[in-house]
């Protein structure tokens, strides 16, 4: 199983590469790519960690050598948020980066599963889909927007509030991956109940958690370490499913039946071909139903922006 990380010299990329080097199954290959010249050195640094995961690093304009034979490609390349910016302010720079890298994936490893981490995910996934479609290699079961950070944040905040072990809590999060489009389904957490005020406050905190980190880092970056952990969790789940493990479920932002929007984050059963089954979002509370209806315009606009970027 070969995993490629594109944007591997950045804050998310390095954290993700470290976690994959220590946690991928024995015999896996890990390939690191970034435009920055430090990338081969990041691979050498990680190669000294004693795990049976082969690692190589590549830098420069051409990602091809890193992508050859990849089964999973995780894309975290791009610029990070600064205070006062929201994820959509990143669009102008990151849209071009994602388009370029996905074109290279389409050429070199068209059958790979692709996880898009680069923000704004609501839009960059639509860009990736349109690029793959133009290249004639789009498979909607193999393209994912990685929203796992919303899930792990939800798990952490709920566990803190309710005095639970974080590992015991699993909150499904649907919708998209920014602001109001992030919808934690708190009504579906087994064995935990919330007051209306708690639901309102928690939902808001989960939606704004990225901004909390950006402000706390005081201009020195955005959420890189928790995002690295979230991306590793998703990537490792995907690898396990591709290798035939049964019953692997993760939420991610994918193209589905279009009931709510062309792309939508929901629980997915993963398998040997990527998405095996898009699972139902279940019964929503009145608060959640309202929030879902209220976000769809924003989500659809984000998606249209990505489609237009490629097709203009």
Swiss-Prot record:
Active site: 177 (proton acceptor)
Domain of life: Bacteria
Result for mutant: residue 232 to T: In strain: ECO R37
Effect of residue 209 to P: In strain: MB001D
CDD domains reported in the protein's UniProt record: MDH_glyoxysomal_mitochondrial (cd01337)
EC numbers: 1.1.1.37
InterPro entries in the record: L-lactate/malate_DH, Lactate/malate_DH_C, Lactate/malate_DH_N, Lactate_DH/Glyco_Ohase_4_C, Malate_DH_AS, Malate_DH_type1, Malate_DH_type1_bac, NAD(P)-bd_dom_sf
Residue numbers binding NAD(+): 7-13, 34, 94, 117-119, 227
Gene Ontology terms: cellular component: cytoplasm; cytosol; extrinsic component of membrane; membrane
Keywords assigned by UniProt, alphabetized: NAD, Oxidoreductase, Tricarboxylic acid cycle
Gene3D superfamilies: Lactate dehydrogenase/glycoside hydrolase, family 4, C-terminal, NAD(P)-binding Rossmann-like Domain
Gene Ontology molecular functions: L-malate dehydrogenase (NAD+) activity; malate dehydrogenase activity; oxidoreductase activity; protein homodimerization activity
Effect of residue 106 to S: In strain: ECOR 27 and RT082
PROSITE patterns according to UniProt: MDH (PS00068)
Catalytic activity, as annotated: (S)-malate + NAD(+) = oxaloacetate + NADH + H(+)
Leading EC class: oxidoreductase
Result, substituting residue 291 to S: In strain: EC35
One annotated GO biological process: malate metabolic process
Effect the entry attributes to changing residue 218 to R: In strain: A8190, E2666-74, E830587, E851819, E3406, EC10, EC14, EC32, EC35, EC38, EC40, EC44, EC46, EC47, EC49, EC50, EC52, EC58, E64 and EC70
Binding positions (substrate): 81, 87, 119, 153
Oligomer and partners: Homodimer.
The protein's role, per its UniProt record: Catalyzes the reversible oxidation of malate to oxaloacetate.
Entry similarity comment: Belongs to the LDH/MDH superfamily. MDH type 1 family.
Name of protein: Malate dehydrogenase
Organism: Escherichia coli (strain K12)
């Amino acid at each position: 199983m070969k995993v490629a990380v594109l944007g591997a010299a950045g804050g998310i990329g390095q954290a993700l590469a470290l976690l994959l080097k220590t946690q991928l199954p024995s015999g896996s290959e890990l390939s690191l790519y970034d435009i920055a010249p430090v990338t081969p050195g990041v691979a050498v640094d990680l190669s000294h960690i004693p795990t049976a995961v082969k690692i190589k690093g590549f830098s420069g304009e051409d990602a091809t050598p890193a992508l050859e034979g990849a089964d999973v490609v995780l894309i975290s390349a791009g610029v990070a948020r600064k205070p006062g910016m929201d994820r959509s302010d990143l669009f102008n720079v990151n849209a071009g980066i994602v388009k370029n890298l996905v074109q290279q994936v389409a050429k070199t490893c068209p059958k790979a599963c692709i996880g898009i981490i680069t923000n704004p995910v609501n839009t960059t996934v639509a860009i990736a889909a349109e690029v793959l479609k133009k290249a004639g290699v789009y498979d909607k079961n193999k393209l994912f927007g990685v929203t796992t950070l919303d899930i792990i944040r939800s798990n952490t905040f709920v566990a803190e509030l309710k005095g639970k072990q974080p590992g015991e809590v699993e909150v499904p999060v649907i919708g998209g991956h920014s602001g109001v489009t992030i919808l934690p389904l708190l009504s579906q957490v087994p064995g935990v109940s919330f007051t209306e005020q708690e639901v309102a406050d928690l939902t808001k905190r989960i939606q704004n958690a990225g901004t909390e980190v950006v402000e706390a880092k005081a201009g020195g970056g955005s959420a890189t370490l928790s995002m690295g952990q979230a991306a590793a969790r998703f990537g490792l789940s995907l690898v396990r499913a591709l290798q035939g493990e049964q019953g692997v479920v993760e939420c991610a932002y994918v193209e589905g039946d279009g009931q709510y929007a062309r792309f939508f984050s929901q629980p997915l059963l993963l398998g040997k071909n990527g998405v095996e089954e898009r699972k139902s979002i279940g019964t929503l509370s009145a608060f959640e139903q309202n929030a879902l209806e209220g976000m769809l315009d924003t989500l659809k606009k984000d998606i249209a922006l990505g489609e237009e970027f490629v097709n203009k």
